[in-house]
Amino acid sequence: MPHVEAITLTRDRRGPGLGAVRLWLYAVAALIIAMVVVGGATRLTESGLSITEWKPVTGALPPLSQADWQAEFDKYQAIPQYEILNKGMGLEAFKRIYWWEWGHRLLGRLIGFAFLLPFLWFAWRGVLRGRLLAKCLVLFLLGGLQGAVGWWMVASGLTARVSVSQYRLAIHLTLACIILSAIVAVARSLSPEPRQVVGGRLRATAWALVALVLVQIFAGGLVAGLDAGMAFNTWPLMDGHLIPPAAQLAAADPFWRNLFENALTVQFNHRMIAYALWTLTLLHALDARRAGGAVAQRAWVLFALVTAQASLGILTLIHQVPIDLALAHQFGATLVLVVATLHLGGLSGQVEPATPKLRLVKG
């Protein structure tokens, strides 16, 4: 009679439809990267305040007539940015900045549909269920929150300011990147590629790298919001100092305001975090040599990307933030984050519960 000879536990992530889910999530991640870059262009061209209202539905249509364009221009002329920075701007010049902001918002709507419609389809077909369904639902809700945060950011520049709050800009950028990392992590967890078991220290530093990249992205958002990259355009010295005088770093009172509002301190922090990230990535790659194989390869690829990103940041700084270098630097940040997330997923990503496989032998 047949009896059970052996039980083998496998981690099966090749269930029906999961490959399509993985491709869908990676496609949405690519759209988010495009959104971050377009958002950077919108900021660098000072286009972000050209649309002064938030209309999630009707705002999808651009002005269709001369009267519509004039109405939008009239609204822009009523805010401080026009009065202080762009007084005398003509309608054609306004159209150029309007299209950047409109395109940024349109891409946000596209991402929403690109996520929601396949999500509903996969859920209806039963491909998304259990923890995977819950994760995707959380991702969708985070996307909705990101849209609201975007308007919250824009609204900060429609009152007495001529630009958006650096606090809100940094939050908006960082939340986009958190969503990007989360989507990539979920997609990676569905890969049939096996994970390599490594020591706790290597896993811990992989987690730390993802966290530190996000901290650096937040710091970069503060630099962008304060236009801090337009000053102190030398490297490795800042205004002739490797470490600026304490009186300048702590010029504002109370001290914590310097961390967010003092352009010198904000740029200095961005530099110091970059050095820390580069050092940690190098140490992690050296540690990964003992694991060998794909783990070591990914760690060294990540180190190369961090090195390239730091070099690009230096070039952007010393050339006083030209738009092409600035956008490449922003794209590089998302690329580093994606690779760090994929690397972490290859070490300790979430997997589906083990499925027992029984082999029956006649006896």
Curated annotation (Swiss-Prot):
One of its GO terms (molecular function) is oxidoreductase activity, acting on NAD(P)H, heme protein as acceptor. Coiled coil: none annotated. Its EC number is 1.17.99.9. This is Heme A synthase. The chain crosses the membrane at residues 18-38, 107-127, 137-157, 167-187, 206-226, 264-286, 299-319, 325-345. Pathway: Porphyrin-containing compound metabolism; heme A biosynthesis; heme A from heme O: step 1/1. It is found in: Cell membrane. It catalyses: Fe(II)-heme o + 2 A + H2O = Fe(II)-heme a + 2 AH2. The keyword Oxidoreductase applies. GO terms for biological process: heme A biosynthetic process. The gene is ctaA. Pfam families: COX15-CtaA. It is a multi-pass membrane protein. Catalyzes the conversion of heme O to heme A by two successive hydroxylations of the methyl group at C8. The first hydroxylation forms heme I, the second hydroxylation results in an unstable dihydroxymethyl group, which spontaneously dehydrates, resulting in the formyl group of heme A. HAMAP family: HemeA_synth_type2. Its main location: membrane. Its cofactor is heme b. One of its GO terms (cellular component) is plasma membrane. Heme binds at H270, H329. Keywords: Cell membrane, Heme biosynthesis, Iron, Membrane, Metal-binding, Oxidoreductase, Transmembrane, Transmembrane helix. Belongs to the COX15/CtaA family. Type 2 subfamily. It is an enzyme of class 1 (oxidoreductase). It comes from Xanthobacter autotrophicus (strain ATCC BAA-1158 / Py2). Interacts with CtaB.
